[in-house]
Amino acid sequence: MPKILDEINQPNDIKKISAKKYTQLAAEIRRFLIANVSKTGGHLASNLGVVELTMALHLFLDFPEDKLVWDVGHQAYVHKLLTGRKNDFKTLRQYEGMSGFPKRKESDCDAFDTGHSSTSLSVAVGLVKARELSEEQRKVVAVIGDGALSGGMAFEALNNAGRLKENMIIVLNDNNMSISENVGGMSNYLGKARTNYRYMDFKGGLETALKKIPKVGDAIVTTLKQSKDSLKHLFIPGMLFEDMGMTYIGPIDGHNINQMLTALKSASRVNGAVLIHTVTKKGKGYEPAEKEPSKYHGVEPFDIKTGKKLKINSEVSYTEVFGKKLIELAKVRNDVVAITAAMPDGTGLTAFGDVFPNRFFDVGIAEEHAVTFAAGLAAAGFKPVVAVYSTFLQRAYDQILHDVCVGKLPVVFALDRAGIVGNDGETHQGMFDLSYLSHMPGLTVIAPKNSWEFERMLEYCIDFDGPIAIRYPKNTAYLGLEDHKKEIIYGKGELIASEEEIALIAIGSMVETAVLVREHLHKLGLKATLVNARFISPLDEEMLHQLTKSHTLFVTMEENVKRGGFGEEVSVFLCEHDYQGIKHLNISIPNMFVEHGDRTLLKEKLGLDAESIVDKICRQRGMQK
């Protein structure tokens, strides 16, 4: 039987498909997504939930003239499929392959590069204003999930969107999930609206009945519609969106293409911003994903029949070590509380929330609030631990500096996914945190070399009287160097092996690489000292002074961009103390955005692997391997 999906090879091809075949096409799209993502990995549940919604948008819009902005963008697979990128799915999130997020350079049907949450509405308002200034006619639609709507930036955009005089359509994809289940007032508000279909039915029936009243029926309906105290305010508390100046349509079934098209066409005739509230099911069409949508949000290659990963990793990750250790510490200290921004699973805090439900706080996608909320807890005598991906902590820079560091409050920042993350690409690499944290006055920044040291550092963080950040990679916890268990002392590194000539000074995850580098150098007849820096801020200047006495080459290693990183700080130290006889190799990430690909492969491409580092050292020493 010929596949309908085979007929869609270019943008707008879906408009050639008969409406009678929409259901079959939706089923084919789901099978295609499951088959391909099971091989490459990627975001599955969110994309399965927006199949019909995306089809309706593509039937309504003309690409690339019209502009469709996806919030976060991980749910844009169906959009990519319908815009001629079907054959690229075999390279999804692979090195030099198709991105898992919208990319303007990938297709002119992608209106904006996204990756972080709650940005779409601001982008759409900008596109609408640009359309107005350019006197163009294109449609502008933003798709945002109910989870992303909990972000403060989304509210800032809504505040401005309500003042628009020209048409802009916001599609609220309400599946009651971000990655994990949503929390907070907005989630509760949408829950009430979601279950209030009776209001829509009652309103429609009442309107019909009133219009049948001779002579005055139409006038009564008009008066009710114009009144701010009309029936909608009795049945839907607040009508938040309309009170902000927008027209609200919904809630409607996001899996019903005809309903979606009717709503979109109606919305396009309104001057100003219109919000279409759609209700969808995350993971729809694949039973394991429907039952456990958070588990299938982001997946590694898996067996379709069982839903289980193809590769079972028995090794423990840093995230797992963190979650287990924090529970242990919280059992000893009643002042320890944990905070996450909609990532309890990803940051390893789900079990903590089960054990200590009253001391666990999921604030939704609101990193700025999470940090200042933690500051408030710290000011009142608690020990808050903010667990967050490195890339997302960027969003709370001012709160860290102004609300935590100025007051020297004892907040712990646990930075997961620090360094090269891999397949999610440039918007998710955690390669900037050392640069934007290490210059903050009073903020201590540390990184562990292995699992044992990670646990000791977490203990140190809980006891530390001041703001402190600990960074660790998306990786299995390193178990090497298990005999090196020197006590953690403020501002002091750890000397692992002492020789002469070359000093290998590594931070966190790069200590494991430095061990391999040293082994290679020995085979080449080169001596090398190995230092586990431990502290990025403050710098262990005493150890650096000592190393200058017997070494002619410093090799610093870090998973962070060169500018503002650990290596640059060491360079400044050497310059300020006029150590002209010391050469310095700064092994770090170039000042560039690193795209998607396997973590190990990306490290090789960036010259962060042991072999590449040895090559650089040999060239610096004027010798060949």
Curated annotation (Swiss-Prot):
Keywords: Isoprene biosynthesis, Magnesium, Metal-binding, Thiamine biosynthesis, Thiamine pyrophosphate, Transferase. GO terms for cellular component: cytosol. Its cofactor is Mg(2+); thiamine diphosphate. GO terms for molecular function: 1-deoxy-D-xylulose-5-phosphate synthase activity; magnesium ion binding; thiamine pyrophosphate binding. Thiamine diphosphate binds at H74, G115, H116, S117, G147, A148, N175, Y286, E367. Binds 1 Mg(2+) ion per subunit. Binds 1 thiamine pyrophosphate per subunit. It catalyses: D-glyceraldehyde 3-phosphate + pyruvate + H(+) = 1-deoxy-D-xylulose 5-phosphate + CO2. The keyword Magnesium applies. Mg(2+) binds at D146, N175. SUPFAM superfamilies: Thiamin diphosphate-binding fold (THDP-binding), TK C-terminal domain-like. It is an enzyme of class 2 (transferase). Its EC number is 2.2.1.7. Homodimer. Belongs to the transketolase family. DXPS subfamily. Catalyzes the acyloin condensation reaction between C atoms 2 and 3 of pyruvate and glyceraldehyde 3-phosphate to yield 1-deoxy-D-xylulose-5-phosphate (DXP). This is 1-deoxy-D-xylulose-5-phosphate synthase. It comes from Lachnoclostridium phytofermentans (strain ATCC 700394 / DSM 18823 / ISDg) (Clostridium phytofermentans). The lineage of its organism: Bacteria, Bacillati, Bacillota, Clostridia, Lachnospirales. The gene is dxs.
